[in-house]
Amino acid sequence: KVRKVMKEFGRDYEVIVFDDASTDGTREVLERYRRVLPMRVLTTERRIGYPGAVERLLREALNRTSYPKRDIAVLLQADFTESPDHIAPLVNAIEGGADVVVGAVQANGIPLPRSMRLARWVAPFLLGRTFGSAPVSDPLSGFRAYRLIVLKKVLRDFGDRPFLTTEGWAANLELLGVVAPYARRMGETPVSLRYDIQARPSRFRAIRTLRGLLRVRRERWEGLERRKTD
């Protein structure tokens, strides 16, 4: 699917996949894809979770570019819930001048898992002003495109220190708070999710995610708001 989309889109690309200590034959499947795709596979022997995987992927994308002002990293799940069909609109928005573009999740008639519906309903009340002050309408979505120069500026300040420490959707909010001070312009484009074709049960946990959102609000976003008013 990625190959078809990118061929029609007409952009050079490389797929970077993170195999988070999988035990379900993922490595064998990826080996077959490497024969037909420009693909690089990162692996770990011990599971590091969603925030660690996202950070590894973004750091690797930055390490592999010679043109950070031009090149773009698009993050999407490899379990088919996020469709490659949305890559082109995300990239087009970056090429149109944005530094970060978020895929804002839209209803498509296919219900989200109950725990996710609960978390999405509670999160705006839990986050309060933090949710309303976010530069995009869906700060919880992880389906995003980043101009790599923004990540380069992030790593200039963070160095080897991890910039993501919170699990699940909370990590998406945390990452938005990390990159926002370095982005001149942020945008969004509508995307839809397909949890009905997910190959394995979701690891999403609503209560853990909501607790993480509270921590991110205190440690990342409230600090960001204070810096804006200083």
Q: What positions do the PLM features span?
A:
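Short beta-strand/loop segment that forms part of the nucleotide-sugar
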Residues: 11-21, 42-44
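Acceptor/aglycone-binding surface of glycosyltransferases and processive sugar-polymer synthases
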Residues: 39-61, 70-72, 84-165, 196-204, ...
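Short beta-strand-to-loop acidic/aromatic patch adjacent to the donor-nucleotide binding site
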Residues: 66-81
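Hydrophobic helical membrane-anchoring modules
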Residues: 1-4, 8-12, 32-33, 157-230
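A conserved acidic beta->alpha catalytic loop
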Residues: 19-28, 80
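Conserved beta-strand segments of alpha/beta enzyme cores
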Residues: 14, 38-40, 135, 185-187
